[in-house]
């Protein structure tokens, strides 16, 4: 499923399981099937692993976004979170205007955290995380910028060296929504980013307080509802290859 790779760092590559996990939720083929198994992955390394986490710079993120756009990515998954950055905002705005759908993890800093970026950027589909009972994942960020929610607690993911593990976080809920978006574009390739966001909101299963809220946005993303939504104009019938998805992974 890997259509291309890009390393924005000048250091020697160190394997990081976060990117493998994200890609597996989108397009895995094996005991674990991704939500969009026909998707072609553009794997990007923009973050330098440091102990348990990873560190990124504005320059490396911008290089990675530019590369993904140049490769024809239709969806960019951004499973990372940090402070607002004007340069990254301009890059995201340009990408959306080119027709690229941008999906980002809300963050795992909890209820008291301010909005984190790029999820809080207006050009982005922001995804919070739910648990097995459709309750908000305790560590998930909240905010009026949340578009939809998706499962993100105790998720089975692939890791390097043919392994699997259970892991939690909004990174995984964002990946699941990126897979849904890839399927939407497979069915209707001419969907715009704004239309994709509108469909996700309109077809989501309402959770929490009635109507949109700061925890779940419009509600739990509904893959079937989003893919089968009545959209005009509808693409010609027939199986189409899923457009390229950049994982934006570490």
What is the meaning of each model-derived region?
Residues 42, 101-104, 125-127, 149, ...:
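Structural detector of well-ordered beta-strand residues that form the stable sheet scaffold
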Residues 15-18, 36, 75, 79-81, ...:
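Loop-rich non-cytosolic ectodomains and luminal regions
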Residues 1-5, 10-58, 74, 96, ...:
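Subtilisin-like serine protease catalytic core
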Residues 29-31, 130, 152-154:
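Short loop segments at secondary-structure junctions
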Residues 107, 228-250:
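Secreted peptidase-domain scaffold signal
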